[in-house]
Amino acid sequence: MEKSTMSAILLVLYIFVLHLQYSEVHSLATTSDHDFSYLSFAYDATDLELEGSYDYVIVGGGTSGCPLAATLSEKYKVLVLERGSLPTAYPNVLTADGFVYNLQQEDDGKTPVERFVSEDGIDNVRGRVLGGTSIINAGVYARANTSIYSASGVDWDMDLVNQTYEWVEDTIVYKPNSQSWQSVTKTAFLEAGVHPNHGFSLDHEEGTRITGSTFDNKGTRHAADELLNKGNSNNLRVGVHASVEKIIFSNAPGLTATGVIYRDSNGTPHQAFVRSKGEVIVSAGTIGTPQLLLLSGVGPESYLSSLNIPVVLSHPYVGQFLHDNPRNFINILPPNPIEPTIVTVLGISNDFYQCSFSSLPFTTPPFGFFPSASYPLPNSTFAHFASKVAGPLSYGSLTLKSSSNVRVSPNVKFNYYSNLTDLSHCVSGMKKIGELLSTDALKPYKVEDLPGVEGFNILGIPLPKDQTDDAAFETFCRESVASYWHYHGGCLVGKVLDGDFRVTGINALRVVDGSTFPYTPASHPQGFYLMLGRYVGIKILQERSASDLKILDSLKSAASLVL
């Protein structure tokens, strides 16, 4: 056989094997209605017992809390306490169109999107619904940057990490259909040098790719709440409208979390205790988790004492090292209407991550979408090009606005661009956006045939015309900054937690959510946090199994001595 023929056969076999591997790793969900089977074990907190006991009490039914609960329920009794409502109360969260709609709805204290303004003066939001932020976000799904694992302070089992991603993906992650504006965006990224072209991939790699979505191809949202369906319904109970006010501690043997106090929507107090070998696991998110620890007396001693909060354990870094990835952007108003699209195409570089989507016009500003309420609104269809600074290195802190009421959101400050490396990365990212705007792919969307970044009808602050003027770009970055809604930190591994996510100095208390790391794990982090809940759940099951085997071996040894 000729060498050329043999080479061709080997190439075909290689591609075939790669396809099989790819298909096996990325076994994704199929389009379906949002699965509410879990409603059979979900209750309003008013219907829960005033005092109950469980193996595990999970505070927060969000992006990490739901997969964590489902996993632990495979063997143990689990109670999930979620302060928000069921998604069925707000059907608009279940559609792609609902992303903007829910940001537009006034916050009445019950809506799934809770509004807050950081002390930086930037509008922001957090989830207040079962499923957490995974049910109000833009639906972008990606696996984490693999480089974060070695720097995390956690001894990861990478085979288990990958298996856990698949567990999530085969239920709520979809390969998106082709969308016209996303195709234009992909062409522009490649023309602007964001290489290589990865095609469709869930992996975080430098270059341009189509990534996964938690919106299926009918526009139905899928989210963390559906992962509850993978649990053991006989062992799992979910309480909504349950505001956890404090963690209960005992001192024998050693400082130990023994349960929580929570109130239902009528203001009635309830207590949920954990059984022997059980745990309280806080998954209330970057804002809610450090807030609850502080209210429970776990935090900086002098600070807690100044608020007359009894100090249970001095933990100086609770509420510290709070980060938020800045979002800077450009909006263009094309001369002709464009169809609305969700984000499915990503441009990944070392220092910044970028994407674009197209939208219909609106007359009510979506809260947090633009830097402030005074930002101009689009009167026609528009395209939004966003750049996210990786990391970031800048950080702030969280403090209590109320020393007794968990329903009062705390003060947060992120100190955007206080670290000049972040500012430099923003400048580089926005220059890349300038290169995108200068591509042939985007010429049809100009209103005038002008060179470079000129010729577009820009909504809001325009990019500097001179791509070499770093000072002008720095000013642009500071003046146009908004939140990417990817805030994180406040209860870091290595500062507050050990490598198994246990709060150091306290038995039977863990934290599993976005408060645990000082950097964003990917361009869009929900994939990592969904994985994290399942991963830690499996690790806990393994710990319990190993402990039980050790006890059994001890009993066998004792019995053999007697005999």
From Swiss-Prot:
Transmembrane feature ranges: none
PTM comment text: Glycosylated. Deglycosylation does not affect the enzymatic activity.
SUPFAM superfamilies for the chain: FAD-linked reductases, C-terminal domain, FAD/NAD(P)-binding domain
Biophysicochemical property: pH dependence: Optimum pH is 5.5.
Annotated residues for binding of FAD: 63-64, 82-83, 129, 133, 137-140, 244, 485-486, 514, 525-526
Top-level enzyme category: lyase
Database matches in InterPro entries: FAD/NAD-bd_sf, GMC_Oxidoreductase-Related, GMC_OxRdtase, GMC_OxRdtase_N, GMC_OxRtase_C
Signal peptide: 1-27
Example GO biological process: nitrile metabolic process
Keyword Cytoplasm: no
Cystine crosslinks: 426-477
E.C. number: 4.1.2.10
Catalytic activity: (R)-mandelonitrile = benzaldehyde + hydrogen cyanide
Pfam hit, one: GMC_oxred_C
Glycosylation positions in this chain: 145, 162, 379, 419
Role played: Involved in cyanogenesis, the release of HCN from injured tissues. Catalyzes the stereospecific addition of HCN to a variety of aldehydes in vitro. Has no oxidase activity. The redox properties of the FAD cofactor appear to be unimportant for catalysis.
Family to which this protein belongs: Belongs to the GMC oxidoreductase family.
Official protein name in the record: (R)-mandelonitrile lyase 2
